[in-house]
Design a protein with these regions (language model features):
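A broad, low-specificity signal for short, low-complexity segments enriched in glycine/proline
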Residues: 16-24, 58-63, 88, 92
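Flexible, gly/pro- and Lys/Arg-enriched active-site loops
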Residues: 46-54, 65-71, 76-156
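N-terminal beta1-alpha1 ligand-phosphate binding loop
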Residues: 1-32, 37-44
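Short low-complexity stretches enriched in small and charged residues
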Residues: 9-19, 50-58, 84-85
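Short, charge-patterned binding micro-sites
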Residues: 36-62
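Short, structured patches in soluble enzyme cores that scaffold and shape functional sites
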Residues: 8-10, 63, 134
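A structural signal for short, well-ordered beta-strand segments
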Residues: 8, 37, 57-59, 96-100
Length: 156
């Protein structure tokens, strides 16, 4: 069994509707259990900033799917929401990223291949990822720092 923290975002159309629909699909998947969502919050765009605000959050789930299989599943959810990858960091109906993954013993996984990088390479630099992650995993530390300490650094 694997444990995942998946960031979720949308900034096109019915933002919360896309997120809710994908959440329900994830809950109903036979290989996924114990799906929990953080609070959804409105945030400013990151990277490419000439676009609408986002609704962002974080999902926790447990699954028998390995990280590459989970990536395939969340990419299917994005596709069902009409996701098109036209501009890097550009507008999207639904954006799902595996932020953290843990194995059945609770060890954090580290993957870096052509299809998947876990932990997500930018998660530690994005407050819109860290705030909802803190809601679901308040004791998390990375690079000898708590989420709150990192958020304080990012706000300086």
């Amino acid at each position: 069994m694997y444990t995942y923290y998946i960031s979720v975002g949308s900034n096109m159309g019915d933002k919360k509707g896309y997120i809710h629909s994908a959440f329900q699909s994830l809950q109903q998947h036979e290989a996924v259990s114990k799906v929990i969502s953080s609070t959804l919050v409105e945030t400013e765009p990151w990277g490419y900033t000439e676009q609408d605000t986002f609704v962002n959050g974080m999902w926790f789930c447990e699954s028998t799917l390995d990280p590459h299989q989970m990536l395939g599943l969340i990419q299917c959810l994005e596709k069902e929401a009409g996701r098109e990858r036209l501009i890097h960091w550009g507008p999207r109906t639904l954006d799902l990223d595996i932020i953290l993954a843990y194995d059945s013993q609770g060890a954090m996984l580290s993957l870096n291949d052509a299809k998947l990088v876990v932990p997500h390479p930018y998660f530690w630099d994005r407050s819109f990822v860290l705030k909802p992650l803190y809601e679901l995993l308040p004791t998390f530390t990375y690079k000898d720092m708590t989420i709150n300490e990192r958020l304080a650094q990012l706000s300086e």
